[in-house]
């Protein structure tokens, strides 16, 4: 007989368990007699039972605590004592059970030695006295025992007993009442020993992570009317009445922060505030939806939610699966099986070993004399396999390890160094994840530029490595037994404390490279455009990094391994470890190849944001991997690339090895110059992040021969910190549209503006040999792009960059003012900027660079021929280049993007004049006559993730949308990243969103180049006419200044001057957003754009041009759409996240997608953004009004208005958008009605026929009740009786007797009201934190009209029934029908299944608790299912295993 079951299966409260252990003398005597008769031996009851009871803490001595003699009663002789000792030594059942439980942490030894006298009649302070050996036994409640021992031993020393007596124990399931909890810590608080029960849901006052997570925990555990964790936003008022209405479940803006359980029922009147039953009142704040509220059961203020669902059991009982290692001895005195396993003192990392630990280690010989407090929690027990088998046989379950809080010096924060713990914790986690991630995780690049402090830290961390090595040994074992924490780490910014390890030769090489980069610009120049580059450090780093570091420290996520080698994936692409660099100003970026487990390390790690993998766009000519700069993705500008480019990852490309740069150069030197920028897919990377400021000195990049290996190795060394040159080259080809100085003069700050310059062609190696030919223009543009990317990335150190820029700007400004007149300067600069804009903004990089260089050279030569000599043309180009270099020098000390953007726009506006317009028109017509590939980029659109976007209608979506999936999702970020993409209008009914405009603006699909609207529409809707005249509407950012370059308008106007018949391209527009992360992007988008004053003068001239080309524009729209559709299928769009999008939807990283899948998702939201965006180009748009009106009517007819999601056939007839009521004449035409209006009309006529207006209808009048109406039967009180509790208990008992519960279910009926809805949500949450539970969605039922049967039909049925089941089945025929209408009721139903009887009983108790509290609104029923099975097959093995074990153990 087992005296007390240690499993803690008792489901009652602590008071109920207390009653179970009250001593009963009669029962004791009867048990003694039965046992002695059954055993038929001379062994006494005391020998058999008393030691076992003692081992479970049920008996304590009254007058002494000498536990070794506890098994001796007054009349006992020495033989029995000797027999008991022998049994303990032989490992009898009691000893095995006790030892197994001890090792599993289920109880704590209470070997107590005291030195104070004890009064006779109390059990609070048992004292051991050497003289007193007279004992009496009394069965005690174990909680009183625990309390007694705790009070007695708070300051007493605990010596191990040398004799083999049984010891007193305390069960995890036998904890004292909640009211006694303060006693557990009150005695030791003076000594600053916080002895908390780490595995219990209620926690003591002290939290070891309080210093780190105090603000988070306080906000989570405090009852507030609203959640302070929400980011406050101008559109997110706390009252819940704005656009971001947390209390409106139909609001699209609620999704990222949506409550765990939105409306579990369908109700009438939704969408109107006074009937909105989903309004969350202040007494049920957000925390109660995320984590259950236990205030009713636990008023203890020390409760802390540790987010461990195994602890959130009903009424804090320890269920059968919860055998957490709650109790053990002090960590300073560790027991392990035969001392074969490392103890806690060994497993603690060196950095967390405090002086106390060291002293303990030194004094191991005197540990027997140390104080041992039994209430200290420890993870030190590591059961051997033999003991673990015993534990599993006894409890039939696995031991669940404690959360990691137990690692912090047993809950005491007194001696723990948090900073050291963080480092060691990261290392342990890194080692723990090394196995599973080593084959997939991108390793650290061996060429990461390291801080000089890394070497010192690496030397200082050698002691930590020893602890990591020991932890690695543990991690090879069963993860259940591993001392490394498996729970999520706290929200600590560990990334700032992670370090990189470099071998000595690597470190020396890095130092040399850093030294070279200080002295020469050429050191940072890569040979191939495949080589990634990123900016060096400038002033913007000072906020975050130490001044003595040459480069900012690399940040990486804690789980990453710190391996030095670059791995090569199966496709031959090299994986670079991503490194997050704070505040990178040069934003030239691209991405590394996508692997399955590839996530970007970013500062959003601290925010808990989900990092979605970003697929790389790699074309076969340039298959090499590119490094993603994650700091750009961190804040609001995540790059999203087309998913269709995945097929390119399988290209058989040469493996790029940093160890052999020569081979790489040989294999790619031929292709890298010509092919690397030839595809417009690569251009999709070129967002405003590709900041291309100006180069200040002659282009040092054109070293193709002997220096190639050296430069490649250097550039690869800097690869992890540099953005690739391809990105910058694309950016510069785009930005050459804004100035000829950018298109040509940036290649070398003096020479490259001459289109046929031989110096430039000499520098650019073989491609520039023919100066005036296409190769020359190609080379010059490529050189300019490389130089601009170098300048934008700030390859050189700040000092050299500043010096060269100052010198060049000084000399060039003087020279230009001397050499050229102002008019010629303006003319050539203006002409070249416009012409290169015409060519470069359009398509593939290759054709664009060729056309832009040719156009700029021709235009500048013609304009300068008019104005002055060729020298003045050169001087004017020099002037603009030096102005831009002035801008870049300004930007290097500040945020380079803003400065260069402002300065270059200023200079270009000065340089632009009316004299150059004719030349630029001619050159642009030549350049535009070429068929160029098209780039589409919308900087403001968030992309839609790759869901099944073929679902276009709301009816289809309403069929597939399973609302319970969102409601039962306990992981906010999961819901956010899966369901909360930006413009998912089809999931919401516009009728119930009064804050969103239902009248859509007219579609500008023909002549609209609005980058916010038509650019994101696919196929015919999203492709625009080349002559379209609309200018981007821009949102004004929070700073109050529009950061969008006015060069967008410039591009529009320059494209609309002269249009030839063969023109098929659409200009490329994007909007740069001046945000924290992409602040430097605006320089690339606005470097040589016109100022607003110049734009006003331009609009008048262009308005005249627009009138002339309007007819041509309309005629060519169809051709353009065909061309652009073809291009859109081949080259996907890239949409940059606007700052508003990043704030509305906190998904910094989003999945890749194809733009042509997106139009249905984004049309409504596009119009909404247009509505919100201030139109700063109103005067310009007025000129285009006639063109836009031309296509308005068509698009309005194309798109039917869907304003009701209840209509299942809503697409077959016209919709009425206006909310005004229709007149009788309108109503008479059924064609003009939507389905719902049609039904309402009939409903009103039927109600008038039956004279039904308001109030109740007699239940016997079936014709009135089941009339044609959409109204539901409404019940304020549920028409059911509550379940008899006695019958319920018996039914549950009968169901669970056979060990199966899958043949039964629980049915909950409840009414529609706010109160009931909130109760059901809480009940759902409480059910779903249990395992093996399936809860259905709350659903309505449809009811057919009733019918009475007469006697004849009943008699016929009885006769069939008497013939047997087969005859009844075969001969039964019932063709009874009705001619009325069905009605539905507002009584909701929910079904709950449980896989095992344990879960079934728990679910029934949970449901019954709420049904008892609300008998008129909620009713519980338990039903049996014939031939029942689990709802899904996942639970089948669970049920079978439970059944087999149940059958086996029931026979014992």
Curated annotation (Swiss-Prot):
Region (62 X approximate tandem repeats of S-S-[KR]-[AD]): 728-977
Function in brief: Transcriptional transactivator.
Name of the protein: Immediate-early protein 2
Subcellular location: Host nucleus
Gene name for this UniProt entry: U90/U87/U86
Region (Interaction with human UBE2I): 1024-1072
Biased composition (Low complexity): 665-680, 719-731, 738-747, 766-791, 798-807, 849-891, 1006-1016, 1040-1053
UniProt key word Amino-acid biosynthesis: no
């Amino acid at each position: 007989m087992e005296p007390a079951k240690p499993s803690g299966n008792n489901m009652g409260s602590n008071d109920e368990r207390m009653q179970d252990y009250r001593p009963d003398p009669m029962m004791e005597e009867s048990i003694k007699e039965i046992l002695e008769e059954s055993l038929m031996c001379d062994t006494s009851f005391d020998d058999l039972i008393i030691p076992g009871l003692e081992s479970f803490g049920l008996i304590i001595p009254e007058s002494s605590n000498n536990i070794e003699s506890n098994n001796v009663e007054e009349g006992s002789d020495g033989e029995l004592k000797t027999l008991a000792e022998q049994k303990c030594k032989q490992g009898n059942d009691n000893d095995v059970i006790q030892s197994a439980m001890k090792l599993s942490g289920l109880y704590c030894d209470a070997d107590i030695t005291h030195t104070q006298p004890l009064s006779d009649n109390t059990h609070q302070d048992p004292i051991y006295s050497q003289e007193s050996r007279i004992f009496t036994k009394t069965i005690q409640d174990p909680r009183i025992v625990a309390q007694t021992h705790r009070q007695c031993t708070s300051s007493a020393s605990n010596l191990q007993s040398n004799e083999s007596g049984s010891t007193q124990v305390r069960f995890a399931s036998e904890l004292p009442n909640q009211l006694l909890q303060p006693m557990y810590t009150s005695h030791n608080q003076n000594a600053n020993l916080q002895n908390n029960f780490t595995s219990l849901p209620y926690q003591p006052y002290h939290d070891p992570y309080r210093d780190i997570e105090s603000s988070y925990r306080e906000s989570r555990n405090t009852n507030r009317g609203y959640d302070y964790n929400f980011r406050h936003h101008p559109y997110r008022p706390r009252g819940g009445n704005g656009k971001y209405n947390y209390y409106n479940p139909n609001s699209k803006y609620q999704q990222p922060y949506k409550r765990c359980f939105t409306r579990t029922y369908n109700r009438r009147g939704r969408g109107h505030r006074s009937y909105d039953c989903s309004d969350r009142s202040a007494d049920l704040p957000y925390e109660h939806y995320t984590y259950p509220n236990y205030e009713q059961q636990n008023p203890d203020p020390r409760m802390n939610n540790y987010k461990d669902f195994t602890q959130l059991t009903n009424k804090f009982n320890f269920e059968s699966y919860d055998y957490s290692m709650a109790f053990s001895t002090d960590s300073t005195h560790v027991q392990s099986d035969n001392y074969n396993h490392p103890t806690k003192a060994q497993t603690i990392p060196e950095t967390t070993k405090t002086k106390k630990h060291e002293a303990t280690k030194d004094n191991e010989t005197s540990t027997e004399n140390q104080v041992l407090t039994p209430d200290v929690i420890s993870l030190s027990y590591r059961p051997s396999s033999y003991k673990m088998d015993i534990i599993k046989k006894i409890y039939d379950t696995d031991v669940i390890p404690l959360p990691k809080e137990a690692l912090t010096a047993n809950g005491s924060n007194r001696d723990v160094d948090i900073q050291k713990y963080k480092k060691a914790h990261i290392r342990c986690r890194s080692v723990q994840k090394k196995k599973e991630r080593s084959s997939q995780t991108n390793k650290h690049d061996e060429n990461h530029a390291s801080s000089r402090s890394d070497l010192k830290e690496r030397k200082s961390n050698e002691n930590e490595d020893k602890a990591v090595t020991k932890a690695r040994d543990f991690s090879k074992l069963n993860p259940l037994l591993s001392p490394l924490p498996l729970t999520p780490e706290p929200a600590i910014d560990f990334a700032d404390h992670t370090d990189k390890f470099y071998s000595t030769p690597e470190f020396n090489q890095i130092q040399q490279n850093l030294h070279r980069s200080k002295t020469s610009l050429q050191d940072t120049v890569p040979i191939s455009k495949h080589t990634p580059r990123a900016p060096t450090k400038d002033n913007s780093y000072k906020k975050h990094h130490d001044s003595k570091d040459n480069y900012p420290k690399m940040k990486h996520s804690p789980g990453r391994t710190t391996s030095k080698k670059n791995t090569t994936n199966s496709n031959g692409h090299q994986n670079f470890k991503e490194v997050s660099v704070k505040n990178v100003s040069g934003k030239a970026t691209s991405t590394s190849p996508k692997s399955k487990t590839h996530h970007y390390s970013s500062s959003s790690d601290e925010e808990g944001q989900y990092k979605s993998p970003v697929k790389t766009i790699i074309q076969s000519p340039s298959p090499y991997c590119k490094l993603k700069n994650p700091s750009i993705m961190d804040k609001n500008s995540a790059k999203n690339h087309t998913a269709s480019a995945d097929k390119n990852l399988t290209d058989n490309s040469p493996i790029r090895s940093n160890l052999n740069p020569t081979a790489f150069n040989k294999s790619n030197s031929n292709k890298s110059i010509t092919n690397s920028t030839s595809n417009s897919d690569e251009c999709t990377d070129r967002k405003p992040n590709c900041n291309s400021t100006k180069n200040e000195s002659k282009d040092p990049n054109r070293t193709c021969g002997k220096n190639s290996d050296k430069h490649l190795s250097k550039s690869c060394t800097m690869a992890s910190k540099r953005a690739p040159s391809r990105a910058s080259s694309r950016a510069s080809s785009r930005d050459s549209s804004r100035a000829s100085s950018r298109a040509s003069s940036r290649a070398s700050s003096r020479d490259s503006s001459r289109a046929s310059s031989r110096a430039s062609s000499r520098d650019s190696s073989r491609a520039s040999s023919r100066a005036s030919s296409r190769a020359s223009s190609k080379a010059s543009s490529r050189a300019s792009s490389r130089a601009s990317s170098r300048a934008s990335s700030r390859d050189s150190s700040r000092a050299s960059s500043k010096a060269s820029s100052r010198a060049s700007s000084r000399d060039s400004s003087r020279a230009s003012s001397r050499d050229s007149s102002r008019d010629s300067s303006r003319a050539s600069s203006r002409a070249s900027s416009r012409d290169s804009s015409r060519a470069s903004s359009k398509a593939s990089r290759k054709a664009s660079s060729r056309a832009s260089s040719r156009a700029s050279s021709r235009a500048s030569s013609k304009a300068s021929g008019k104005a002055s000599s060729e020298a003045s043309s050169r001087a004017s180009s020099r002037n603009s280049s030096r102005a831009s270099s002035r801008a870049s020098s300004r930007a290097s000390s500040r945020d380079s993007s803003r400065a260069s953007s402002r300065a270059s726009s200023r200079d270009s506006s000065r340089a632009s004049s009316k004299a150059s317009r004719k030349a630029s028109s001619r050159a642009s017509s030549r350049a535009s006559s070429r068929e160029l590939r098209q780039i589409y980029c919308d900087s403001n659109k968030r992309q839609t993730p790759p869901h099944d976007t073929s679902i276009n209608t709301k009816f289809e979506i309403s069929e597939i949308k399973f609302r319970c999936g969102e409601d039962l999702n306990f992981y906010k970020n999961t819901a956010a990243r899966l369901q909360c993409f930006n413009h998912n209008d089809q999931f919401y009914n516009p009728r119930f969103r009064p804050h969103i405009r239902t009248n859509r603006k007219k579609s500008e699909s023909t002549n609209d180049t609005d980058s916010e609207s038509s650019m994101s529409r696919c196929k015919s809707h999203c492709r625009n006419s080349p002559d379209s005249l609309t200018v981007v509407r821009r949102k004004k950012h929070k700073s109050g200044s529009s950061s969008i370059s006015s060069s967008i308008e410039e591009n529009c106007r320059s494209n609309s001057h002269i249009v030839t018949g063969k023109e098929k391209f659409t200009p490329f527009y994007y909007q740069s957003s001046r945000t924290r992360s992409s602040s430097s992007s605006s320089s690339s988008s606005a470097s040589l754009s016109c100022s607003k004053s110049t734009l006003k003068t331009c609009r008048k001239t262009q308005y005249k041009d627009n009138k002339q080309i309007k007819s041509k524009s309309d005629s060519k729209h169809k051709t353009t759409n065909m061309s652009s559709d073809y291009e859109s299928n081949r080259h996907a769009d890239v949409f940059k996240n606007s700052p508003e999008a990043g704030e509305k939807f906190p998904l910094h990283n989003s999945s890749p997608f194809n733009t042509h899948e997106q139009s249905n998702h984004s049309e409504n939201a596009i119009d909404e953004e247009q509505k919100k965006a201030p139109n700063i180009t109103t005067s310009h748009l007025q000129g285009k009004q006639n063109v836009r009106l031309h296509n308005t009517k068509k698009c309005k007819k194309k798109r039917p208005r869907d304003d009701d999601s209840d209509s299942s056939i809503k697409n077959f007839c016209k919709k009425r958008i206006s909310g005004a009521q229709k007149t009788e004449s309108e109503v008479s035409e059924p064609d003009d009605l939507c389905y719902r209006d049609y039904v309402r009309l009939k409903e009103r006529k039927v109600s008038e026929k039956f004279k039904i207006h308001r109030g109740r209808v007699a239940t016997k009048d079936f014709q009135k009740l089941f009339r044609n109406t959409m109204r539901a039967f409404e019940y304020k009180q549920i028409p059911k009786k509550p379940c008899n509790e006695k019958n319920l208990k018996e039914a549950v008992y009968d169901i669970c007797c056979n060990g199966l519960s899958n043949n039964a279910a629980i049915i909950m009926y409840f009414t529609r009201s706010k109160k009931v809805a909130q109760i059901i949500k809480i009940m759902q949450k409480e059910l779903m934190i249990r395992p093996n539970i399936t809860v259905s969605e709350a659903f309505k039922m449809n009811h057919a009209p009733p019918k009475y049967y007469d006697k004849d039909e009943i008699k016929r049925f009885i006769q069939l029934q008497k013939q047997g089941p087969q005859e009844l089945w075969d001969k039964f025929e019932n063709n009874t029908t009705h001619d009325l209408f069905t009605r539905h009721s507002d009584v909701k139903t929910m079904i709950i299944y449980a896989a095992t009887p344990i879960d079934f009983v728990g679910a029934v108790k949970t449901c019954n608790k709420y049904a008892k509290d609300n008998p008129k609104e909620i009713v519980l029923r338990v039903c049996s299912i014939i031939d029942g099975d689990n709802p899904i097959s996942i639970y089948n093995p669970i049920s079978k295993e439970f059944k087999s074990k149940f059958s086996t153990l029931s026979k014992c």
